[in-house]
Amino acid sequence: MSEVRVENLSLAYGVSWSGVLFINQTQLDLAPDNLSTLDFTIFHELGHQWWGAVVGANSNDHTYMVEGLTNATALLAQAAVQGPDAATNSLYAWMVTPYLNLLGGSGDAVADVSIFDQPASAPLSTLAYGKGALGFLAIRNQIGDTAFLSALRSYAESFRLGIAEPADLLSAFEAASGQSLQDLWSVWFDQAITTPAD
């Protein structure tokens, strides 16, 4: 695995390709005291070595399957390596706060939206990275860590070097947990009905 520090990746903090992480030095220099930004960026881009690289999904049509799942699992990795406080800080900085700002502003929007059909009032980044991750964390809360990780393992094995659809990931969570999760899945990914209480 190589890390390459680059001067400009537009507005992205990092980009991942197979075996290489590009870290945007220019963007990170804007907040040199914020090491957690660098830390979470690296956890997120490492996550793309699985979600998006080894296990594919149509990220143009179902961006949350790659970005939301990567954010959710990056939090798990960060908690394991740096402790739960670091992961909680990243959760709020990268997912909860942007999503609450959306809810308080233009209101909720559907997370499973094509990059070509995204609403102007709801940035895809907030939906895919924020609401998407929160949806996967809601599933984890519903089914527990063991079933959640078992589902991800099964999903990764089934779609290694393949392209999965949303129903494939939902099926993996349902099979691992023995629960019907369609309603919970729909609330977070297919509908625009969540509230700050969710």
Feature-to-residue mapping (PLM):
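Amphipathic alpha-helical substructures
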Residues: 85-87, 123-198
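Glycine-rich, acidic and aromatic/proline-enriched surface loops and short helix-turn segments
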Residues: 10-15, 100-102, 141
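Short, solvent-exposed loop/turn segments at the edges of secondary structure
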Residues: 15-18, 36, 65-68, 130-134, ...
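Post-HExxH zinc-binding segment in Zn-dependent metallohydrolases
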Residues: 20-29, 62-107, 179, 183
